[in-house]
Amino acid sequence: MEYLNDEWDEFINNTNTNKPLERVFPDESFKPEFSNLYISTQTKIGYLNKCIPLEEIFWKLPIIDYNLPKEGILKKVIKINSKTPEDVIALDKNITKQKNCTFDVLLQIDSLTGKTTKFKDIRKITAGVSKKDLINFRKKKKSAFYNCFAVIIRIKYKNKFHEINIKLFNTGKLEIPGIQNIETLNIAIDILLKIIKKKCGYEYKYLKNKVETVLINSNFTCNFYIIRNKLHNILKYTYNIHSCFDPCSYPGIQCKFFYNKNNTIQNGICNCKTKCTLNKKNKKKNSCKVISFMIFRTGSILIVGNWDENILDII
């Protein structure tokens, strides 16, 4: 601490020091200890046994008060397209019946062109609040998806309350982002289906054998600092890994790992006759799974992609 104070005094007094900068590099005895891999969030897709009447169920789902320490639905969001003024009047009546309900008009057209009248009213309906609404303030409001509605369910897991986001599509498909384990997913869906059965009169079965993992975010740390430009050159020119490093736009090394289950050696390089592309429009034609990982100066490594947990050790 005294050494730092002396340096600060020299800087304040504009005193020039001839002390050379010391560059410290690890020697041969340095043995790094990598941390365990931590799966932070997963996005899963599930299915119910039949289709869902979205609007009917949405209006009947009850919202619990945020201050009450119990399980239930905290928030629900839907996007509704009204094609006539009568539909808007009926929509306003449903909104007034809901507790803590607001709406945002995303698009409104009411014009007369010749002999035809064009009318369109698109609204995002939001009822209830979640933890994110109380902590964060978003100036630009997010839109919502068609043919589905989203609910945030509070569950109790290991004596702690957690909030789980579930999107329900009219086909019976479920999308659950941001979960850490399958147990919280099953608890949340079980609570939701019980509420639908009790309040709406519809009985659905959750098909547990059809659950798919579409995205996993994981990370670990090397426990030492990384010289990014040198590592970038090694990855790109020695190992031929698709790598990009521009510290002005992103602080880490952005890499792509091409995984193909048919390859005997997984080196992260695409060996297909028709090279796999990173273009979003042509991604469906790829034979390889493209997994992204980012390497930061502090030694932290973030892995993102649509893959199975068994592929982690290979990467």
Role assignments for model-derived ranges:
Residues 1-315:
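Intrinsically disordered, low-complexity polar/charged tails and linkers
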